[in-house]
């Protein structure tokens, strides 16, 4: 069995009120177009064709080289859009899935069931349908007394009886590929909207006594077509629930799953504990046994097993096992932390590698640095890495001790087991086993404070 897929992505999406094409709006980290394309891969299509139109270059970039593309210059209806794909699929034997690019909730499992149903029943066309409590606005499935599908009627063309029908067209179909394009040559624009309806091919098939069927979705949410921001928010809510439920089934504990945002490509190992208001985005991986406390935000990062991240932000970073971060820490892109590193409250790290068991507990900035293992970085330490034009590197050896309130002016190297005195400004190399002191000598003037205006004795 050879399968093909057509994704309809040419529309502007006026009701979105956006400069961004509708299909490029995101749901749980992926564009609606990407969601549809990924779901369509469940049928293993030999060829996928995406129909583009409005801002076609931008939409094309959303799938890059994963699909063939055809251009619909004028948006003259769904039937006209599918006609554009004939140049790619004409004359091919097999079954063609047609899916709208604005239905992000449709699952691969449902599409696989749809095409299996189509093949097993030897249909020339199979419609994916759903039962709606309120069917207003949807195309209605019209059946005869024997329960056979005889046509699909759009809302504007439906009579009073048809408007009462609850079975609706989801806009997803499977067709015999050759018969699809033959039937499309017979449809007209003789309807309320003056468009070429793809749904009109159903009546054509029936007139030729060809078999048409319908596969009914179990979950109505999958049928959601996103046409405005309200529907986009609904899709986001449903997708978020799906994602958290998937992770819970796989052994992840959530204290308050309704408040957690996890994108589609995030991977979480079993026995992770996630508190409320946690955000996980992009290609993030969380290792087993890790704890993410309230307010943590992680994007495109790898967190090693058994780590504890407390109310902190982590971006494009790699953390080994047993790391502790926070509260209120910020790991910026390019940060690598080895095993059992501790990054404490109000510490910022950027573009740096920090060796195992090193600690930076408080109020510190480490940028463009190579820090060895078992280093103690005292509170208030700053790596001065930027001169207004270029960034420079600081290198700190193993077992070094950086005193509190040290200012390290790069480029700089501090050797193994070296020490900088608290309050020092260090701008020259500190050799192995050395102590560097870079501060003014303290001068104490006894009794002098009594001469100052703030002293209590001055108010008498």
From Swiss-Prot:
Binding-site list for UDP-N-acetyl-alpha-D-glucosamine: 8-11, 22, 72, 77-78, 139, 154, 169, 227, 332, 350, 365, 376
Residues annotated for Mg(2+) binding in this entry: 102, 227
Single GO cellular component term: cytoplasm
Claim: Metal-binding is one of the keywords in the record: yes
Region entry Pyrophosphorylase, spans: 1-229
Oligomer status and interactors: Homotrimer.
Protein name per its UniProtKB record: Bifunctional protein GlmU
Native organism: Streptococcus pyogenes serotype M49 (strain NZ131)
Taxonomic lineage of the native organism: Bacteria, Bacillati, Bacillota, Bacilli, Lactobacillales
Encoding gene, per UniProt annotation: glmU
